[in-house]
Regions:
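Predominantly soluble domains enriched in secretory-pathway, periplasmic, or organellar proteins
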Residues: 14-528
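Sec-dependent bacterial lipoprotein signal peptides
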Residues: 1-13
Length: 528
């Protein structure tokens, strides 16, 4: 195993002119997993540092300077950029500069790339990003003002078009109507067109969730007016939790705490007022689906013919509701248990073939399988098949792109099983140890995991359930499986320590240990 160490502490102690960064309060944000990188954000050094697990098996470390005092970071869904909100500061002493809050877009693919700074006016601590990585919305969490927040507007949002450089219209700052509640989250829709609208383009809509209200903003045109819709009529105290979309009909289906039923939100054409330059061209309609019970979980899938369906579990009625997303017609299937977990296989956007249902709230030693092959046939009989698994199921995690699911049978993650969805069979997972952290490789061929305090990386080949392990030099904190097949184990060292394993077939001699990389170049940091 190769050890790359950066011995900087002695040099720092002897430095005559200490850089201001040495005396700053230091908070590390991350790691943030990306396509083939793992990134950290350093609040003292004002930079993003990333390990690049390159395809040639030789990792490298790169850094990018950003603004002062990072608050929050999030990856883009394509795994190519990391977005960071920085608070900025007021220059009051040596080493400080006047700087407003900014959102930084850092392209980690290119070590020479220059981060793009978008002025966002407020130190937001949450970021929502569209599935195509083109639009970001920065907002405040429900945590309330921090120690430095004198005034804070919880209903303020910043809409950023990540495909354009910053200008007078990018970002667009917006304050939405609150109706007495602050946003609990933001969900960005896939691109979808409003049926019948004069503007036929496919747009992204931001669904701003709050207690008893949902506000919808055209995120592709954030300067246009938002529309809010009250949820009080759907229950006594409705808190939206989850949305799934049917973009063909500009429809969202919502699961909410406190709602009596599955809620349907449909965007319809509403021609704008020609005298109002900020008028929008849509209006939402809210409907209770009539499924007869509040859903505990929902899932969306597409058939081989391109039809979209929504599955909703209603434990109070012990039913699974199957909704045609384009017509809102539905049918019900009785369930032996009050289901609160739905997993659709094979996943990864492929046409679904099977749904597996489980009761996790009050764990039972069984799961249920529903074939989705005849789901579009209204005359087809839909029956559940019960699969006895021997131990209560406390968690159910699908393997990416495979008809497999890992079952956890105890709170310590020591008793595990692998469910083969196609053959309805269960195999106990042995020789792995306690899974404190784990990940599936993107191809779904390996389960990798670590145990706190044990310097080993466990690997389970899912085609034959053969376990192997790799000895590490240091105890692990978290393991990450990147899109290019590389594995990175973070050891939780504040100065930076990680083990990079090029592939699951790599031996110990092929692994690289990077130590001290978060301090690289500290003495070269310029002093203002």
């Amino acid at each position: 195993m190769k050890l790359l160490s950066l011995s900087l502490l002695a040099l720092i102690a002897c430095a005559a002119d200490r850089p201001p960064a040495i005396d700053r309060e230091r908070v590390l944000i991350g790691p943030v997993p990306l396509k083939r990188q793992l990134a950290w954000i350093d609040s003292a050094l004002d930079r993003v540092v990333a390990i690049d697990a390159s395809d040639d098996g030789h990792p490298s470390v790169h850094s990018w300077r950003i603004g002062r005092r990072p608050v929050f970071a999030a990856p883009t869904p394509d795994g190519e950029r990391v977005l960071v909100v920085t608070r900025g500061e007021e220059a009051l002493e040596r080493g400080q500069v006047d700087e407003d809050p900014l959102l930084w877009s850092v392209d980690v693919r290119d070590p020479s790339s220059k981060p793009i700074a978008y002025p966002v006016s407020s130190p937001f601590d949450r970021i929502a990003v569209s599935a195509d990585s083109g639009i970001a919305v920065a907002y405040f969490s429900e945590a309330g003002p921090d120690a430095e927040g004198f005034f804070r507007n919880p209903n303020e949002l910043a809409f950023i078009d990540l495909t354009r450089p910053p200008d007078e219209t990018n970002p667009t700052m917006k304050t939405i109507r609150s109706f007495g509640s602050a946003p609990s989250g933001i969900v960005l829709s896939p691109r979808m067109a409003v049926p019948g609208a004069e503007d036929p383009s496919e747009r992204i809509f931001a669904f701003v969730l709050a207690r008893n209200v949902v506000t919808i903003v055209d995120a592709s045109h954030p300067d246009r007016d938002e529309v809010s819709i009250r949820l009080d009529g759907a229950g006594s105290n409705v808190l939206p939790r989850e949305l799934v979309f049917a973009p063909n009909t500009a429809t969202a289906y919502m699961r909410s705490d406190g709602a009596r039923d599955v809620l349907e939100l449909v965007l319809i054409n509403d021609p704008p007022d020609a005298n109002n330059p900020t008028a929008n061209d849509y209006h939402p309609l809210l409907a209770e689906l009539g499924a007869g019970g509040a859903p505990s979980d929902i899932a969306v899938f597409d058939t081989a013919s391109g039809l979209r369906y929504v599955l909703a579990a209603t434990p109070a009625t012990r039913e699974l509701v199957i909704i045609d997303a384009d017509t809102a017609q539905f049918r019900k299937v009785g369930t032996p248990d009050p289901i609160d977990r739905i997993v659709v296989f094979p996943g990864n956007g492929e046409p679904a073939t099977t749904a597996v249902l489980a009761q996790l709230g009050a764990p039972m030693p069984r799961v249920h399988s529903l074939s989705l092959g005849d789901i579009a046939n209204p005359l087809a009989r839909l029956d559940l098949e019960t699969i006895e698994v021997g131990e209560p199921v406390r968690d159910l995690s699908p393997v990416p792109g495979r008809d497999l699911a890992m079952m956890v049978h105890d709170d310590n993650r020591t008793v595990l099983g692998m469910l083969d969805v196609e053959f309805r069979s269960v195999s106990p997972l042995q020789g792995i140890g306690r899974l404190d952290t784990y990940a599936f490789t993107p191809a779904g061929d390996f389960l990798v995991g670590t145990t706190t305090g044990v310097p080993r990386l466990g690997m389970l080949e899912l085609s034959n359930l053969h376990p192997t392990d790799l000895r590490l030099d240091y105890p692990p904190r978290q393991v990450y499986a990147l899109a290019n097949g590389a594995l990175i184990v973070d050891h939780g060292d504040p100065f930076g320590r990680a083990t990079v394993v090029p592939t699951t077939a790599s031996e110990r001699k092929d692994a690289h240990v990077l130590s001290g990389f978060l301090l690289a170049g500290l003495l070269e940091t310029e002093s203002p």
